Amino acid sequence: MSAATPSVIRLPRDTSAQHAARPAFVGSDPLTYGEFTARVEAVAARLLSLGTRTGDRIAVWMDKQPRYAEAIVAALEAGCAYVPLDGGQPVSRVRTILADAEPVVLFTDAHHAALLGDDDLPASVTTVVAVGDALPDTVGGIPVAPWESWEQGRAGRVTLLPSLTPGDLAALLYTSGSTGTPKGVQISHGALANFVAWARDELDVGPDDVFAGHASFNFDLSTFDLFTALSCGAAVWIVPDAATKDVTALAEGIRRHRITVWYSVPSVLHLLTTSAALTPEHAASLRYVLFAGEVFPVPQLRALRELLPPGTPLYNLYGPTETNVCTYHRVRPEDLHRATPVPIGLPITGAGTTVVDDAGRTVREPGAIGELHVSGVCVTPGYWRRAEEPVSTAHCRGVHPTGDLVSYEEDGRLVYRGRKDRMVKLSGYRVELGEIEAAALRHPGIAEAAVLVDGSGPKARLRLYYTLCEGAERIGLVELKQHCARHLPTYMVPHGAVRLDRMPLNPNGKTDYRRLGLDAPPRPAAPLGTAR
């Protein structure tokens, strides 16, 4: 990028020049901006010494910690793209993602390095760097380099940042795929820089703020926590994996670290507000609360409002991974008494929105429902190595058909109305039900599989319906869940299962999802949490 083009790769360096002694990360592993920048520059120099080129992928698989952020920023400073992997993902899924992304370097920790077998790394990986004690000598036949040796600056430091264009690849974020295989969403430098610039313009944040890094680094919400904070000299509390759903630990962390900016999915905020852990005293430092990823029921939003300091701004942000945040809405007092969900609002700077009906015509009248199409710099170039997909073809035209149904309100704000397809949101994560079905069908005893969601919001649960192969023995729920957990992240493992004699079909011979659970099977459907 030219000097005139904003880029997230300059953020830590520019901030460190002004705030070297100020905290960049707080918590169990605190770092100042000076310390963090020195580490990043040393690691970036080592990457460049390997001969990495612009757009090369750098994978990161470890527990959440400041070194995870260090690996991300170092990859970007070297002109590479980061591929973040959640620490809780099963090895089989990690293997699939690594094979698709073909990274040249893997940053990991001792625990996750020990989980990898000889055949789990693709041939593209030439270097493995790990943090922790008792590191294995090799992973997949590749010697493991201690992280500390990379931080010592033996390769010098990066003095000249790479020249990048807005279209260059910054990250590959893997999401659930309808075909049963995760797909990588390409995030460009231009899109990332545009989002951070909008956030800085919209929010009055600076060096005195502390962001809560609640989201997993493989979730697009994390780009706000990390890069917005680094852009303004604020500190980040990277919420440990074990604390992400522990309301007591979260509430105490908010109080202890005096968190001023919170961003998460609504279900986490609902857990906090319905527990006795979060009190007005714990929340006293909060200056901004933002949420995204799923609908926030208005009664739950009212309960949150009552716990926060008077006047604390609440923001509803919207956008699939393919666009990151593309619309926003600052909650108004009257929104707390709506009968319908809070609006997803208006486009951010650099984004355009169009509502399209089934015939492809633009919808403008208030109340009329259509699919939301997003355009602008925020839109991904497409899915990694899936240029043949229809959505990728649309991306070539700079448009992302979201699959989300919306309508306009009288004032021009958008309201979310549901989905066109079988993609759902659970705890903010995008879940393609077809991927769960594909994983279930890998069990040798299952002939057919279908997945539905029971309930909504924080009470949403996945239920698997299946038929057995001829001659197969009965499968217990524990076995089914263990099987799915070997191929899927925890949030995609079904909570309950129902065995059917036959799968209901529509006139076209396809699974009739509307009849699942409605038709009376030969035996009563198993209640949630049981299997027959």
Swiss-Prot record:
Annotated EC: 6.2.1.53
Enzyme class: ligase
Cited CDD domains: DltA
Pfam families in UniProt: AMP-binding, AMP-binding_C
Classification via Gene3D superfamilies: 3.30.300.30, N-terminal domain of ligase-like
Catalytic activity: holo-[peptidyl-carrier protein] + L-proline + ATP = L-prolyl-[peptidyl-carrier protein] + AMP + diphosphate
This protein's UniProt keywords: ATP-binding, Ligase, Nucleotide-binding
GO MF: ATP binding; ligase activity
InterPro entries hit by this protein: AA_adenyl_dom, AMP-bd_C, AMP-bd_C_sf, AMP-binding_CS, AMP-dep_synth/lig_dom, ANL_N_sf, DltA-like
Segments for region (Disordered): 510-532
Family that this chain belongs to: Belongs to the ATP-dependent AMP-binding enzyme family.
Described purpose of this protein according to its UniProt entry: Involved in the biosynthesis of undecylprodigiosin. Catalyzes the conversion of L-proline to L-prolyl-AMP and the transfer of the L-prolyl group to acyl carrier protein RedO.
NCBIfam families in the cross-refs: AA-adenyl-dom (TIGR01733)
Designated name of the protein: L-proline--[L-prolyl-carrier protein] ligase
Organism taxonomic ancestry: Bacteria, Bacillati, Actinomycetota, Actinomycetes, Kitasatosporales
Encoding gene per record: redM
